[in-house]
Every structure is written in C-alpha cells, then in structure tokens.
Amino acid sequence: MKAIKQKKQVLDNSMIEYEFFEDAMLIGIVCPLPSYQFVWRINKAFNYMFERTHEFEVEVKNEFYEVYCFAEEEKLIEHTIYVNRKNTHFLLDEIKHIDFIWMIKGGALPQEYTTQLLMYLNEVNAVVHSFVLNPQQLKSKHLLIL
C-alpha cells in the first residue's frame, strides 16, 4: 500500500495584517529612558492615562516586551505603546534603532493630528527623535497584533 503524503497547511495572515493596520498609525520613538519613566512623561505631557497591560505583553524568544494602553473613548481612538528594546533584544529586529513604538488606531486621523503629535512628542524631555513608521515595510509587524 502506498503511503499518502500529507500537505502542510499554512495560514495566510496577510489579510488579517492588512485589515489590522489599515486604520493604524505607527510612530517610532528614540528615547533612552526605561519604559515606566517614558510612559510617565507621555502621560504628563499629553494628559493621558497609559497603563501597563500585563495580559497583552508580547513574548519573543523568551523575552517579554511590555505594552501600555490608553483609549480615548469619546474619539474612538486606541493608543498602544510597545517597548521595542529589552536589554540587547528587540521586539522588531528590523528597527533596532527605535526604543518604543506608539500605535494609534481608530477614527479618521487628519494629517495635522500626526504633525502636532510628532511636534509635541519631540518636545518631551528625553525623547531624542520620533517619526512615522510605514507598517507595510515592517517584516515582523504581526507581533504588534494583540
């Protein structure tokens, strides 16, 4: 009797990724502070209430990367800050120069919102630089889907 070779089935997540990032804006932030100090400064500067969300921590290669969340419910906007650097490891290896990733999802975000956010963010003490990231250029963007 001839053995039947089974095919491996591979799940194509490209459509899920596309839909997830369709209404998202990503900001890369260079800041040498520990995550709790960085988030505290963001909360003070923007009058936000980011909180660490333990159930949404991202694990990659036995390293846990913190996630901080805040929702502007009246505007239907969700803010998420991911820690990208943990000691000498990175959540997204392709952007090793970035310490934090700030994702903003929901609502129609006008261009002036982005411009003002970057301007104010660059004024936060200890933030060296911040800029918009293109999620389509990130190979491991699936790690940002919670």
Where are these regions (language model features)?
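Acidic, serine/threonine-rich, charge-biased low-complexity segments
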Residues: 1, 51-53, 58-65, 78, ...
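N-terminal, charge-rich interaction modules
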Residues: 2-46
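Noncatalytic linker/hinge segments flanking ATPase motor cores
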Residues: 10-11, 17-19, 42, 67-72, ...
